[in-house]
Amino acid sequence: MLSSILDQGSYLILSDFERQQQVLTLARSLIFEGVEKLNGPASRQELEQQGLSLLHNVLAAEQIGPLRDLVMPTLRPALLEMVCSIGRLLGIDDEFFVDDYTILRINFPYLVAKEASRSAENPGIGRVDESTRKQSVASKVVDPNYNPKAYHNNEPPAAWAHGAHRDTWTGHSRLGVNLWWAVDNVPEEASMVFYPGTLNADFEPDRRSLYLAEGYPLPKPVKMSLRKGEMLVFNPEVLHATHLNTTSVTRLAISARINPVRPRFSTSCFYAREFWHSSTNIEAGHFDRVLRFERNENLEPAIDRSVVPPKFPQLIELEADSHDNEWKRVCESVKIAEGGKLRVRFGNENVLLIRTSAKLHASQANCPHLGVALADGFHDEKQLFCPAHGLAFNLQSGLSSCTALRLRMYEVEERQGDIWMRATNRASVHVAA
Ligand code: FES
Ligand SMILES: [Fe+2]
């Protein structure tokens, strides 16, 4: 099992494992208790009636951090034990390591989270042992290129979602195995997004976001729903992302990480997750013994990948006014093969032309969420997937599963071997996504 995850980049979903029900019950009851401590018994009662997936109805986004502070220290020993038993289930016989950094991922629906204040925590922020916290604060490293606020377009941190990445790009260890555990039912559009087959592909991160740089086309994303209690186990070097939570429910998951061997870090990231528990200590009940593997002493030379330059679809620049109704000739039809894309600078607007087997479509070229270039996203006959957070846009209408995020569409026609387009009828499309 372990080698297929590590060597082939596959993933598996565990539906039944040791300590699963006991720790799930503990995690859920700690969340209910935390809500009661923060907002009183009436809020707890309301949450018990409505279900945890409606947590955002009783908790403000600004209280996600305080709730984590209440839940994680008590949950930590039981969680470490459960993670350790999963390591054994995966077939690791010898001593292995469990990351001290664990995350209670609370992703409110995007439309709720985007109204939060700046002080509300990012869903991807974890918690560590108290001793680790003090040491990490003392040795914090800052990279001047890294600017997550700019990537997230200054949206409140509670609304942030991870773009496509490998975990070693963000300071995690080599040869890790990620555990991602559904504390409540997780619908597909609030889940993880995977790009199978990308384990050994040549991709580069953008140094400003540590997510995939522009110019690397992605394969079809795999999205998966999980039932309450199911555990996704995957190789974090396969490109993966967080789906923008376009549902009306809060996503609740806990993530942890195993390293079958002593953790080592990539030279490509400026910091490293240095604090770990050994399976020997966890199995002996020593949950507060944390080992430190200092980055500088545990670096591994970068994997020798050829540096592949980014590849962008052809760009055609047209003089145009997007407010008039005039048709403009773009280029010869043969410039876009079936399944291909072409970028057009239409006056001062960026447009993406996409050819399916049936027809040509023209849409705005950047995602209405954070402006990421859609040219790298996979498309099929009906949909274009954003390469950042997996959102699917209908190629006919531009609609997505989020009412606030819709692509502007352009009219496009082929006449006697040429492609023509114009920017009209923007409000007249009524096709369902
Ligand atoms: S940038 Fe987030 S879904 Fe496109
Ligand atoms: Fe990740």
Positions of PLM-derived features:
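N-terminal pre-ligand scaffold of iron-sulfur
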Residues: 309-380, 395, 408-433
